[in-house]
Amino acid sequence: MHANHPRTLAANLATFARFGCLKDLPEIVYRILHGPRDERKDGDDDSSRVHRRGGSRNNKRRCVGGGAEAAKARRQKETEHAQVVLSRYDSDESFRFLYDSVAELFAELLKSDLEHLRSGDTAKIGLAAKWCPSLRSSYDRSTLLCEAIARRVFPRDSSPEYLGIPDKHYAYRVRNRLRREVHVPLRKVLELPEVYMSAGKWDELPYARVASRAMRQYKLAFDKHDKSGVAGFYDEVRAGLTRIPADAVLPHEILAAALKGEHDESAELQWRRMVSSLVSEGRLSNCIAMCALSSSVEKPPASAAIALGLLISELSQDPWKGRVITFDATHQLHKVRGASLVDKLRTLAAVRAQKGANLQAVFNKILNVAVAGALSKDMMVKRVFVLSDMEFDGWVGGEAWVSEHEAIKKKFAAEGFGVPEVVFWNVGTSKASVPVVAAQAGVALVSGYSKNLVRLFLEADGVFTPSAIMADAISGAEYDALEVLD
């Protein structure tokens, strides 16, 4: 976009940040300057870096021999990066406009947050301080953004001490002020876990304020440095004295450890919080899932299918609650057993796809259970989700579905029930063979897997139509703020 529509990109930065996150803006600058970053190696995440920071004496001894050469190479790389930034800024008008726009956006947000801090209105403080590059951080060394932001927060005419001094002295002073007077106080009031971790104040961590993703990301570090503290927090959550964040995290992400057979107390509590929240909203209240999986359930997209299957089973009401329909000739209501997520997923993963599954028989099974249990109309299954990472070979489709569906409707009507809708979701591909077409009554087809699809699934109460998916993709209010300039 920068190559073809540079002014449009720069002018819409604030809107793009709302689509994603403010941290995307320094990354855009970095990639334009230096190209894509190398993918991190497995295990090389922020949590591992934090608790390695101090290092051990043995590590320090091992570094003595090559320390001077490594430091020299590092300084050389920083110099090269700085030269790239300055050269591009001076010679490329489009890049200069983008760079200035990023710096000005951060500066304005930080100044606004400082005003909220001074007035005591801390609830209005945003996350600009969290995602603004820190002094001497990787982003700062490779983009020089800290200085650019600092110059805008503390311009020369903002203080007599800056008048008449050399530019490099002015830059040094405002960079330090940015850290001391902006980053530190704002990050402190945000209670960011990284602030406590880097200061070694593990026992002061406000776990109830730690975002759900950070709880997962720093799990090993929390357990290592503050095991009793995090255990006490979990006890308070179980007792109902506080709540564990479960924001912006999807079902299969919460289940990541359990899918590997590992117990994760944080995930257990986040899962309960998610289920409780969705139940209170009445989401997916009378639905049932069929999970037809052929591959390992540990990785997407199969992990998304089994996570949604478990979630649907826990959100339903009796007699559907805690059950899934087997994907075989028997179409049994399989009970998901176990107290922990590991146990539940183990029983659910054991239900493998087999030959003989038939949609007509699935409806017959549901109707028989409803009649035998003398269920009221509002207790009937509203929607059947067929979740699979395979193609739907052998299922009814095309013109045959019309007669099949009419026969099913008559059976249900004879017992006073409406017919459940069917959602076929092949999470394994976007080009699956399909049993029905999107226009057929009582059926929705979803192919492929993405986080946005999972979010839509939860937000739309499992109602999938082509128009709903398209509307979700392009009709958000945030799109109204976009403008094209070139």
Please tell me what each predicted stretch does:
Residues 1-304, 314-486:
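Long lumenal/extracellular ectodomains of secretory and single-pass membrane proteins
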